Amino acid sequence: MKTAHYLAALLALTFSTASLTALADDMTPYGDAKVDMHKYPKINRVYDVNYDDPKKLNALVNFIKNVNKVVPGKAVVVLHGTEIRAFAKENYEKYQAVIDQLADLRKEGVDFRMCNNAMHGAGFEAKDIDGFVTIVPAGFAEVISLQNKGYKVIDATATAVKDSRYIDHPEKKPQS
């Protein structure tokens, strides 16, 4: 008799665990997310970029491309951090992949402006910087000036979300 109770309890536990796992995979108490893929109006925007590492420019490229896909309007990138060294001609070989992508964005209409103060502070002159960039008197003042002209300021903090799902659940990542 004890064996029958033990087997019944074991079966119940097995099925309840399987049911809970299926429930966790398929449902939460909140249901499914709503989808609202509406159109955005024309919005002129300025990306305020002040990175401590030029490698973060890779995330900026994707960020701008994704916003440009869904938001019509003009886009300006104001550079005033240490990322500016990536735009120096002497560093082209080191940063070529991202600089070429940014130059392609320029061809698509994205305007790149660099702070004169930051450029000089980093030890560069205008002649040292790639030709698709415009040097402006001051980065913060440029952002404020564009804001006064109706541009919306976008904090271009470089945070990539690609594959972030797998931080908590690495077992769900598809194998290559």
Q: What is each stretch, according to the model?
A:
Residues 8-18:
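Bacterial N-terminal signal peptides
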Residues 22-176:
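Secreted/extracellular ectodomain signature
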